Amino acid sequence: MRTESFGELSGQDWEDVCNKLFHARYKDNYQEVPARYGGDYGVEGFTFDGQLFQCYSPKDEEFSSKTLYELQRDKITKDINKLIKNILEIRKLNKNQNIQNWHFVTPAFDNKDLHEHCRKKEEEIQTAIGQFINNDFKIMLQTENSYITEIGYLVNSKILQIQSTNKSYTEDELQLISQSDNEIVNKIRTKLQKLDSLKENENTLNKYTYLVFRFFIEGQEELEMLNKSYPDIFQGLSRLKNSIEKKVELKSMRGIDLKDLEKIQEEYKSDLEKGFKDICEISLLENLAQEAIADWMARCPIDFD
């Protein structure tokens, strides 16, 4: 399932990320339950003061709201049943501490009915094993937004890398977007058609135009994610881009061609890797380098006069 902070993650990847987040928040008080037991008990881990945790990321990338709700609802039902069945074994793990809350941690949810389902399951738990849980026991729905501080800490500590959003647009989607961003497309096309290698070949010119436009649109998705989830890192990337932009503008004044453009992109990517390779995965940095070229071409810094 797609996450805002780490792009597309498998169920196992999400579990690994969650365990790091739990360790960051609860320190040594958080204990992982080995998978061969956790799968049977309906918990990923626990704390000694009575918090239980379960992580869940559905396999597919795109869901309707109804489908996502049904998957998450059924997972909660299944694991709460395991919790009820194995409560005595779970109590052995956390020194017979009564259970305070059960945390269901998923990348996102978008249906209020999931809250209602949790309230029903809380009543079932109180009826079935009320002597082993607190009177105010709750099923807590949590997403990555519940752990923003921990995500920032782990990224800055270089324990986790920021992943690409992996957002990719089809040709039809690009055509549709270009209708609202027509000025950008026209600027890119106007500059590219000054090149001898492109101006005589309309088909190739169109392909290059939409390739650069793709770099721009998909790169903007990456920047939006960074600005929202990692504002400090976004500011650092922006400062680097602005400093390189001045050099690019000077090179453009002396005249550049497609080979020069490729060299500028590689040099910028190298600068990105020097400063951010420990905290950003390489595909994200590649997308940012491509976005910069497209952005500079859509504005003023790069021209082929």
Regions from the PLM with identified roles:
Residues E4, L9, N29-A35, I139, ...:
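Generic preference for hydrophobic/aromatic residues in regular secondary structure cores
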Residues M225-D305:
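Extended, amphipathic alpha-helical scaffolds
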Residues M1-Q12, K167-S178, E262-L272, F276-K277:
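Interdomain/boundary linker segments immediately adjacent to catalytic/signaling cores
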Residues L68-M253:
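Acidic metal-coordinating catalytic centers involved in nucleic-acid phosphodiester chemistry
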Residues M1-N98:
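Short, surface-exposed loop/strand segments
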